[in-house]
Design a protein with these regions (language model features):
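Short alpha-helix boundary/capping segments
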Residues: 3-11, 18-23
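Core segments of cupin and vicinal oxygen chelate
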Residues: 44, 87, 93-138, 182, ...
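An N-terminus-focused feature that recognizes amino-terminal "leader" regions
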Residues: 66-220, 225-231, 259
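N-terminal beta-strand motif that seeds the catalytic metal site of vicinal oxygen chelate
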Residues: 68-100, 163-166, 223-266, 329-339, ...
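C-terminal functional regions that serve as terminal interaction/effector modules
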Residues: 83, 96, 335-450
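Short, structured motif recognition centered on aromatic/hydrophobic residues
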Residues: 89-95, 112, 132, 139-141, ...
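A cross-kingdom feature marking solvent-exposed beta-strand/loop segments within repeated
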Residues: 116-128, 145-165, 170, 174, ...
């Protein structure tokens, strides 16, 4: 039986559930390992503590998730969108108590630079906005000028500082909005235009999970540096005295949901934005003795925008996802992953700037080295330096990724930042989830929230 894409789930009693994806769907069958002798189980390899490859005497090869449960990489994109195209993340908008200070923090600590400004001096009488940029990454921090701004005031009271809007750069915005309307999406603001001497920009805003929005931006007729109404920001003389970080672009943005809300949200992206499922894991894999989660990664047809959707699963104690939802007051953005092509230099310099990261015990690297000894994958970075910096490593037969997570970016235990480098690896660090969970649980315990 040829294998296109398979998953094997540990069913207990020395049995594995084999799921074989074929054109017509997914076939599942029970494989009882007790039926095979040691000779028939001619060989196996352990990768990342997750994948085991069995080579049977018949030549049948099974790449199995033996210990941790069900992970799926989707090869079928489904039906091609009827029109419209998502090009990339455009920018991320934060609603915060003090936009100037928040922007300054991300510049001083994370390596961003002042990029754009919109405020009283530019004719914006109610909202101030400070935009910061690092390569292709743009964050915009907004605050209210006046005490009577009920919408922003309620948002800050409920959520604290957090992501209000994940903006996408798109083509054919008319079709995207038309399909979203047909599928029942809540349109916060229908298509409108803004213009200045550099051209016209077309926008529309949709409601996604919680109080989070997606603004669609068509820049095809605009040549300005950012958005109409913004002027270029003044230089921060502190920047030239600090080490460069070299973060390149937004890799993915993760949204946390309340229990049993992951599937409805994933369905919303499938129907309203014509996204498809790219990758998923369940709570049999992503767990510790205390807590667990489930995750589905949604992406556009071109797979340039990736949006993981998480939900908590029942556990002995409060999971990191549940803690987030309780402190944020609803579903919202848990973390933003920023891609770099030199994570060692990036993290060394971030630490010099005073950024704090989740700790990883040394035994993680001891076990990693043992697994790498039996793997074909070769890590080109110095493992000693990766260990010193507490950078996590995940890999499969095709390549590997390096990742690290900051501590929370504000007092509430909500948003944090991930720094990631990919070497021919399109996953999301499933092999590191246990180490990550345990590191987060240590922080939860310090807060009295575990």
């Amino acid at each position: 039986m040829p294998i296109d894409r398979n998953n094997v789930t540990n069913a207990g009693n020395n049995q594995l559930i084999l799921s074989n994806t074929v054109a017509s769907g997914t076939n599942r069958s029970i494989l009882d390992l007790s039926e095979f002798s040691d000779a028939e189980l001619a060989g196996y390899r352990l990768r990342c503590g997750v994948w085991i490859t069995f080579v049977l005497a018949t030549g049948f090869v099974i790449a199995a998730k033996f210990s941790f449960g069900h992970e799926t990489t989707y090869t079928d994109k489904g039906k091609k969108p009827v029109g419209g195209k998502f090009l990339s993340f455009d920018h991320v908008k934060f609603w915060v108590g003090n936009a100037k200070q928040a922007a300054s923090f991300y510049c001083a600590r994370m390596g961003f630079e002042p990029f754009g400004y919109r405020g009283l001096e530019t004719g914006s009488r109610h909202i101030v906005a400070h935009a910061v940029k690092q390569d292709q990454i743009i964050f915009v921090f907004e605050s209210a000028y006046e005490p009577g701004n009920e919408e922003m005031g309620n948002h800050l009271s409920q959520h604290g500082d957090g992501v209000r809007d994940i903006a996408f750069k798109v083509e054919d915005i008319d079709t995207i909005v038309r399909v979203a309307k047909q599928k029942g999406a809540k349109i916060i603001k229908d298509i409108w235009e803004e213009k200045d001497e550099f051209g016209i920009i077309r926008l529309a805003t949709l409601q996604t999970y919680g109080d989070t929005h997606h603004t669609l931006i068509d820049r095809s007729k605009y040549e300005g540096f950012f958005l109409p109404g913004f002027v270029k920001a003044s230089e921060d003389i502190l920047i030239k005295h600090l080490p460069a970080i070299h973060l390149k672009f937004i890799d993915h943005i993760v949204g946390n949901q309340a229990d049993k809300q992951m599937e409805p949200v994933a369905k919303w992206y499938e129907e309203c934005l014509q996204f498809h499922r790219f990758w998923s894991v369940d709570d049999t894999q992503l767990h510790t003795q205390y807590s667990s989660l489930r995750s589905i990664v949604m992406t556009n047809w071109e797979e340039t925008v990736k949006m993981p959707i998480n939900e908590p699963a029942p556990g002995k104690k409060r999971s990191q996802i549940q803690e987030y939802v309780e402190y944020y007051g609803d579903a919202g953005v848990q973390h933003i992953a920023l891609n770099t092509n030199n994570i060692i230099t990036s993290i060394q310099n971030l630490r010099k700037r005073g950024m704090e990261f989740l700790d990883v015990p040394d035994n993680y690297y001891d076990m990693l080295k043992n697994r790498l000894n039996s793997s074909k994958v070769k890590i080109i970075e110095d493992l000693k330096i990766l260990q010193e910096l507490k950078i996590l490593i995940d890999y499969d037969e095709n390549g590997y990724l390096l990742q690290i997570f900051t501590k929370n970016m504000q007092d509430r235990p909500t948003l944090f930042i991930e720094v990631i480098q990919r070497h021919n690896h399109n996953g999301f660090g499933a092999g590191n989830f246990q180490a990550l969970f345990e590191a987060i649980e240590l922080e939860q315990a310090k807060r009295g929230n575990l």
